Amino acid sequence: MLQTQLQLQLQGVSIFHQLGLLIGLSLILSITWTAYTILSPYLRVKGKRIFNDRGRSELLWTGARKRFQAGARDLFKSAFAQNPDAFYIMTDTDVELILNSKYAAEVRNDKRFDIGKYNEDMFHGTIAGFEMFEDDHVLERVFVETVRNKLTRAIGKFVEPMSQEAADGLQKQWTDNTEWHALPLHQSILRTISQQSSRVFQGFPLCRNPDWLRITVNHTVTFFEAAESLKVWPHPLRPLAAKFLPLCRKLRAEAEEARGIIAPVLKERRARRTQQVEQSIEKNTKNEKKEDEDEDQNEDEETPGDMIEWAEQTANGAIYDPALLQMKVSLASIHTTSDLVSQAIFNLCSRPELVDDLRKEVISVIGQQGWVKTAIYQLKLMDSVLKETQRLKPISIGTMVRTTTSPVTFTDGLQVPPNTRTLVSCHNMWTDAVHANAAEFDGYRFLKLRQKPGQENWTQLVSTSNNHLGFGHGMHACPGRFFAATTAKVLLAHVVLKYDLKLLDDQKPDIIEHGAAQYANVWCGIGVRRRKEEIDLACPMATV
């Protein structure tokens, strides 16, 4: 009996001892992690000043991150006034080195500046649901090569189909109502561009499948919201947290739904391709070379020309996720193009004389040439309007995001340590030293510059330079910018020819700033009314 009581007492002591050890260990780990979180940014900048530092009363970096989210552009301006070349700053995610755009020429093709590593760290590329940003993933190779080598070369064949989708989308979203009526601009443009893009990415009829269009629009929003929800967790706990956080679960569910929609299409495509190969082998004979050539040509004509097929060709048997690729294409193109077009329309609403000139250009160019690639190039005023829109409001105040893989020393002596996140500022696009009256919107700005000898190339929307970084610069410049420019011009042509535009009296389309990102106002609507277009855009050359 006495022995039993003694054993129970010892067990009680042992339990309390273990509990105490557990609490003590948890406390030590918590203190260690907090100390690391506080000190890590200072250690990585090696004694250099960090702008947007912790305040005197701030223990953690939470306040600094919130300040960056609320006023990044002002923080950049203040920091550049003191350090014109480069400075470290605490962003809403981590400390980064912000570079003057003069360094863009050196960063642009330097492989020590790694975009894949940056994106993997920023967007949790190793965690389930975020795989589209995993570094060195076959998906990234298939994505980039397909866009550069297939999509860009095929744009000319899709100008007219994109016009058809623009007409269908606008008729559904903006209607044919000839009376003034208000509508949500950004959402209507987003849906129309999603339909245009899907015509090229997935072909007909998938481009008009409401479930597919819903996913392509919503998945990007879900992705970035899920990424933000995960950033508040310590790095070691993020894979576990992602299993339970509602937005991360929603992200994975949308990807599964996308796979369910695209799987039958892909299965049918692969079966047809296998059948074509088998038929070709059966018909192939040594003395009928000409027939073989004709057969190959017929196969090419029968093969659907869209991103689904091009990705299959590019992968060449490599294992990848076709649905995830389509989501990545949509993420990279639909929302950014919609943002550019929405902001351009806001700019046009208060400039009726510019709208009139754009109408004249569309009537002249499309009316004489129809929906062909060369006609899109000849829409030079429209190109200028879009480039000026992007100059004043790029999608981010910093671009060319990278992480250094080894030490870098620029030609002027500026040193960048390895594993440093870098970003090139776009602020030169807003300075009078580069552009006269830089703060003012001038839709004719780049058209006038383009007419000067030697200025033809850099003044085009798709051209990048140290002083215009809207699409990035160098080997990692946006590979889909040629497609984005074509999509935007086709849609704007329909907008200006078919509708009158105006701002609503009670709404002001102020830019939405969130950290380094800048968005066209998603809550601001506009007034539109249907007008009788001067040419029928369904068959423009027949009505001139």
Swiss-Prot record:
A Pfam family of this chain: p450
MF annotations from Gene Ontology: heme binding; iron ion binding; monooxygenase activity; oxidoreductase activity, acting on paired donors, with incorporation or reduction of molecular oxygen
Keyword Transport assigned: no
Residue segments, region Disordered: 273-305
InterPro entries (alphabetical): Cyt_P450, Cyt_P450_CS, Cyt_P450_E_grp-IV, Cyt_P450_sf
Requisite cofactors: heme
Biotech use: Chevalone E derivatives produced by this cluster are interesting candidates for cancer therapy since they synergistically enhance the cytotoxicity of doxorubicin (DOX) in both MDA-MB-231 and MCF-7 breast cancer cell lines.
Family matches, as PROSITE patterns: CYTOCHROME_P450 (PS00086)
Pathway: Secondary metabolite biosynthesis; terpenoid biosynthesis
CDD domains xrefs: CYP503A1-like (cd11041)
Gene Ontology terms describing biological process: secondary metabolic process
Record-level GO cellular component terms: membrane
Coiled coil segments of this chain: none
TM region positions: 19-39
Membrane topology summary: Single-pass membrane protein
Chief site of localization: membrane
Subcellular localization, as worded in the UniProt entry: Membrane
Binding site for heme: C478
Family: Belongs to the cytochrome P450 family.
Function, in words: Cytochrome P450 monooxygenase; part of the cluster A that mediates the biosynthesis of chevalone E and its oxidized derivatives that possess a unique five-membered lactone ring and can synergistically enhance the cytotoxicity of doxorubicin (DOX) in breast cancer cells.
Protein name: Cytochrome P450 monooxygenase cle2
UniProt source species: Aspergillus versicolor
